[in-house]
Design a protein with these regions (language model features):
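Alpha/beta enzyme core
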Residues: 3-11, 25-51, 58-76, 81-204
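Terminal accessory/targeting
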Residues: 9, 13-21
Length: 204
């Protein structure tokens, strides 16, 4: 069953469970994620980053959509950390049910403007949108770094951002970071910040 992120997270939030998100851009990884999710009867998010998107063909995404649609388990097909409107539209045209517009490194008002533009377009075709405020560093699979550049999410920005953009869910920064943590580095997770954001956030 292929659904969008808003539908999945509403159920998860109501029933207090987490949903795993797994990057899978080739068939063996994709099959592993789907088969294990089905074996556990667990909803899951299959996601692709923009840098990985073009490694697969449109035929692959058609296969992915068909496989997820025919499953008895709910799945979301999600673009992770899209940086531009064009990247998000490309994913929507390929049949993704959810996209992320990550404008967290932009000035706040520019992040709002860009995220709202994507949200308005995506909602026309039933695709959900994730936004981000606060930053978790530069995404990297090979370099140690990014972890010293965390900008924590300000709870006071959450309601304003969601109201102005209309996003369906929100990525926040509470101390985790992209990339490989340097040896000896211990992330400082601000769980009390997470609780404060949860109290005021109108979306998951």
């Amino acid at each position: 069953m292929l659904i969008n992120m808003e539908e999945m997270l509403k159920v998860a939030d109501k029933n207090q469970f987490a949903v795993g998100a797994f990057n899978a851009t080739e068939s063996s990884l994709f099959r592993a994620v789907v088969e294990e999710a089905e074996a556990q009867n667990a909803p899951a998010i299959v996601q692709v980053a923009p840098g990985e998107f073009d490694f697969a063909t449109r035929d692959f995404y058609q296969y992915v959509r068909a496989r997820l649609s025919n499953s008895k388990v709910p799945f979301v097909l999600h673009l992770d950390h899209g940086k531009t409107i064009q990247q998000c539209m490309k994913a929507i045209q390929a049949g993704f049910t959810s996209v992320m517009l990550d404008g967290s490194e932009l000035p706040y008002e520019e992040n709002v403007r860009l995220t709202k533009e994507v949200t308005d377009l995506a909602h026309m075709v039933g695709v959900s949108v994730e936004g981000e405020i606060g930053t978790i560093g530069v995404m990297s699979n090979s370099d140690e770094g990014g972890v010293e550049n965390v900008t924590y999410t300000n709870p006071e920005d959450v309601i304003d951002f969601v109201t102005k953009t209309g996003v369906d869910c929100l990525a926040i920064a509470i101390g985790t970071a992209h990339g490989i943590y340097p040896k000896g580095f211990v992330p400082k997770l601000q769980l009390e910040l997470l609780e404060r954001i949860k109290e005021v956030a109108p979306v998951p």
